């Protein structure tokens, strides 16, 4: 095995596959990519409708869970992370949400200089191949294919949800990834010709064809090799044997918001007390490693449907067989979508500059494991506040890389977070009570109309909320004078040369949306920084903000 490379990347996930492609693209640099998981060539990964299978599989995901969460009455929440080529982009729901422009301006305000929206937009566009073609906001010839699924044509409930939002006094938006995030409209997904567009399919497939690129799967990375606070390589286990490889230029951790923290701490980089408690010799005391952990929570707000038009009628094995057969033969139909084809982003109160609540609409009533919630037809919205105040941490518990780390999000630990949830439940109920839903809406299944007071909502949320699987921000970028900043604005680990982190852990704050799109953008921009390329010129595109955001929660008056 070749031992020396210009760049070594740990983790073939949403960011690692992008870096593998971009760093090997010129042919001038040798690149090694190490991945713990294996092949992504499974129908359960590639067929969009099968998304619940890989996420709940030991084969394709690290099945982490949180420590007992005090403000969820001691519940432990599921926290799966991709362990397969493509990482979490191969097991996620394929929802493509960049986040609001103000999220990235917030990053810069928090000390990540050069990561404002004007600087990030060109990299979102470079990554993307939007099915409707390039415009000022969308990319038209990038590796990552995005589309709107079946464009809401296969179920009238998608449009009814958008109409209900308008009747409740909210705007409609034709493209939440473009000029206007706020409002109700169609939802976008990373799907190409009916197949999941993971970063493995979009980026890694290109790198694999190059002689200067090497991929090794089934690897457990033990630690980053350090010489006098300089990263020189990695030590890893392959087929039961310890091996080392060396990096001439840089080692890059793209192991995700849990994995990158583990790797830094196992290598002696992190809070001194955490390292010593785990039996790891501290090399460099960096107190922010594993801190600032953030996530999105969500609930399934469910109703019976009065018409037999929902996906609940397609969950028997015969129907699944027909859907699968059509997909195998044509790559079309109900197998070719994640079924989230309409959505919304709203503000929960006046005085918020940009949305903090997100809706995914699903024409089915399902449980978290993908099974039917009950006999009969129903629909649901996945909803939750997206700008939590609560902050958590990730800590290794031993020097063994296979020991699961301690993960504590401290969900709902602030009064603001709890109030956001009360607002969220009440606003959702109001939206779904609008006239556009009348012909479809049956009884409220959950929360149930008996959940109405603050105390009742608080208790129901504690018992029913789940992670949206968006752990992030645990190795944040920040300014030199921020003692908790793990990275500088070029994703370089403070105090250690030739070492970067590039994945969702670098975010200073969690954006208002799903994480895959901004993680890919971060990797695109980081690739230019790593290669010392001139960054793409900033793009001064306008962004819509509600004209009366300081005094009004929404732009119009509700019909009901």
Swiss-Prot record:
GO biological process, alphabetically ordered: glycine betaine biosynthetic process from choline
Entry-linked Pfam families: GMC_oxred_C, GMC_oxred_N
Sorted UniProt keywords: FAD, Flavoprotein, NAD, Oxidoreductase
Matching PROSITE patterns: GMC_OXRED_1 (PS00623)
Presence of the UniProt keyword Oxidoreductase in the record: yes
Binding-site list for FAD: 6-35
Listed EC numbers: 1.1.99.1, 1.2.1.8
Pathway in which the depicted protein is active: Amine and polyamine biosynthesis; betaine biosynthesis via choline pathway; betaine aldehyde from choline (cytochrome c reductase route): step 1/1
Catalytic activity, as annotated: choline + A = betaine aldehyde + AH2; betaine aldehyde + NAD(+) + H2O = glycine betaine + NADH + 2 H(+)
Top-rank taxon: Bacteria
PANTHER family: CHOLINE DEHYDROGENASE, MITOCHONDRIAL, GLUCOSE-METHANOL-CHOLINE GMC OXIDOREDUCTASE
Family, as annotated: Belongs to the GMC oxidoreductase family.
Protein name (Swiss-Prot/TrEMBL): Oxygen-dependent choline dehydrogenase
Organism field: Vibrio vulnificus (strain YJ016)
Name of encoding gene: betA
């Amino acid at each position: 095995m070749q031992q020396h490379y210009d760049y070594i990347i740990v983790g073939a996930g949403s960011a690692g596959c992008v870096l593998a492609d971009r760093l090997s693209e010129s042919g001038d640099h040798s690149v090694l990519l190490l991945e713990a998981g294996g092949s992504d060539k499974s129908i359960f990964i590639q067929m969009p409708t099968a998304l619940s299978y890989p996420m709940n599989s030991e084969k394709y995901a690290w099945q982490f869970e949180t420590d007992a969460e005090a403000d969820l009455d001691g519940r432990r929440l599921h926290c799966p992370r991709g362990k397969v080529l493509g990482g979490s982009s191969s097991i996620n729901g394929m929802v493509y949400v960049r986040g609001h422009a103000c999220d990235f301006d917030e990053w810069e305000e928090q000390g990540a200089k050069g990561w404002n929206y004007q600087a990030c937009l060109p990299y979102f566009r470079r990554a993307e191949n939007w099915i409707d073609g390039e415009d000022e906001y969308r990319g038209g010839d990038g590796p990552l294919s995005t589309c709107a699924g079946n464009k809401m044509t296969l179920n009238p409930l998608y449009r009814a949800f958008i109409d209900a939002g308008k009747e409740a006094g909210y705007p409609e938006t034709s493209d939440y990834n473009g000029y206007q995030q706020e409002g109700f409209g169609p939802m976008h997904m990373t799907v190409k010709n009916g197949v999941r567009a993971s970063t493995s399919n979009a980026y890694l497939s290109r790198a694999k064809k190059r002689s200067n690129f090497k991929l090794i799967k089934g690897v457990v990375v033990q630690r980053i090799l350090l010489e006098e606070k300089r990263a020189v390589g990695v030590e890893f286990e392959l087929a039961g044997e310890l091996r080392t490889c060396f990096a001439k230029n840089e080692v890059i951790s793209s192991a995700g918001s849990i994995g990158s923290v583990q790797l830094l701490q196992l290598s002696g980089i992190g809070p001194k007390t955490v390292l010593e408690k785990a039996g790891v010799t501290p090399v460099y005391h960096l107190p922010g490693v594993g801190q600032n952990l953030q996530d999105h929570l969500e609930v399934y707000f469910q109703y019976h449907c009065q018409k037999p038009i929902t996906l609940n009628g397609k969950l028997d094995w015969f129907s699944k067989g027909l859907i699968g057969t059509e997909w195998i033969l044509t790559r079309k139909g109900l197998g070719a979508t994640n079924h989230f084809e309409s959505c919304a982003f709203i503000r929960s109160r006046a005085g918020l500059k940009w949305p903090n609540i997100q809706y995914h609409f699903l024409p089915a009533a399902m449980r978290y494991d993908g099974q039917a919630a009950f006999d009969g037809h129903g629909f649901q919205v996945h909803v939750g506040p997206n700008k939590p105040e609560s902050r958590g941490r990730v800590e290794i518990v031993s020097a063994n890389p296979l020991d699961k780390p301690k993960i504590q999000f401290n969900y709902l630990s602030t009064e603001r977070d709890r109030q956001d949830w009360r607002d969220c439940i009440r606003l959702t109920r109001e939206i779904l009570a609008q006239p556009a839903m009348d012909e479809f809406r049956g009884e409220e299944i959950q929360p149930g109309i008996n959940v109405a007071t603050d105390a009742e909502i608080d208790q129901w949320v504690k018992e029913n909320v789940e992670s949206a699987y968006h752990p992030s921000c645990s190795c944040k970028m920040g300014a030199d004078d921020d003692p908790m900043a793990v990275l500088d604005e070029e994703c370089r680990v403070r105090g250690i040369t030739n070492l970067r982190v590039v994945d969702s852990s670098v975010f200073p704050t969690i954006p208002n949306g799903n994480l895959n799109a901004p993680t890919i953008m971060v990797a695109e921009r980081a690739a230019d920084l790593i290669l010392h390329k001139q960054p793409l010129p900033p793009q001064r595109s306008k962004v819509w903000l509600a004209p009366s955001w300081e005094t009004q929660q929404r732009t119009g008056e509700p019909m009901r």
